[in-house]
Amino acid sequence: MDVKTLVGEYYASLPSGVLREFVEDPSSREWAYTFLKGRDIVFTRKRRLDEVSGFLELYHSTGKFKNPKSWEGLLGWDLVIDVDAELPEEPEAFLKSLGRLLKDVVIACDELRRALGFPRPDVVNFSGSKGFHVRYFDSTVRRWLRWDLHERRGIKPGEIIQRVGRGVVWLAREGFVAGDRVRALREGLLDDSMYDLKRLIRCVGSMNVKSLLPAVPVWSREGGRWVDFRDEVLGMNDLELGCLVAHRTLTWPGRGGLGVVLSRVLDLDTDADPEDPSDFVEVWGNVMSVLGELKP
């Protein structure tokens, strides 16, 4: 099996509409894709999600526009925080580091709420490679920023985003967001890309071609209360938590998904209990070995 076949089988296994599930008003977004041509990965933009097929990766704009193709008529904006770390390749070390990073994400979200008045996230998802994306949807951002009030005062949407974004980044860099576990906030966790009006972000459910793992949700508002998720995350050891996240990459969205494809097409055993780390680490190591041989 080659990369193109694996990725195609993965997308074909997903239920209809699942790639739009965590995108508010998808018709107002610019969509972008990567394709494999020969040995090169090429990037292209299109107007709508249903305009193309055969892609490797899928991205959408964080902004919402009247005319998405030309980025004109800003209607709203998702705030997305990208939390990355250098994760080791050895399976058990990778899983421990992944679990530790998710704990840092949860603590950082609570600290942003305490120090800067951030709302609760709408979605936290594994990026498919080195970390997590924390997503605040446009509807949440509007309430938080009192968007309608600013518009009545004649402030354009782009100005609202730029003012707030620069202010939040400055506060974080100046140390108003404290705590040893969130020191990364002053080292690039909140950066200028956060309020870039033309920013593109990997779609939840998209494959990440660097790792051949999908970007899957680990928590959403629809899935339960933030406080329960936080307590569960902080109450687990790093390895157990990393196993749960990795297991999610194999089993999401519950019908189809990467694990089903690997089992069906490559006869690879992906059926391991994440609550039994010794068993899961072995299975995960096999998965990483197989995917590593396929990477472009």
Swiss-Prot record:
Organism the protein comes from: Methanopyrus kandleri (strain AV19 / DSM 6324 / JCM 9639 / NBRC 100938)
Role according to the record: Catalytic subunit of DNA primase, an RNA polymerase that catalyzes the synthesis of short RNA molecules used as primers for DNA polymerase during DNA replication. The small subunit contains the primase catalytic core and has DNA synthesis activity on its own. Binding to the large subunit stabilizes and modulates the activity, increasing the rate of DNA synthesis while decreasing the length of the DNA fragments, and conferring RNA synthesis capability. The DNA polymerase activity may enable DNA primase to also catalyze primer extension after primer synthesis. May also play a role in DNA repair.
Stored InterPro entries: DNA_primase_ssu_PriS (IPR023639)
Quaternary data: Heterodimer of a small subunit (PriS) and a large subunit (PriL).
Keywords: DNA replication, DNA-directed RNA polymerase, Magnesium, Manganese, Metal-binding, Nucleotidyltransferase, Primosome, Transcription, Transferase
Cofactor(s) needed: Mg(2+); Mn(2+)
Entry's Gene Ontology molecular function annotations: DNA-directed RNA polymerase activity; metal ion binding
Family: Belongs to the eukaryotic-type primase small subunit family.
Enzyme class per UniProt: transferase
Protein name: DNA primase small subunit PriS
Active site feature: 82, 84, 191
This protein's encoding gene: priS
Gene3D superfamilies cross-referenced by the UniProt entry: DNA primase, PRIM domain
UniProt cross-references to SUPFAM superfamilies, sorted A to Z: Prim-pol domain
GO biological process: DNA replication, synthesis of primer
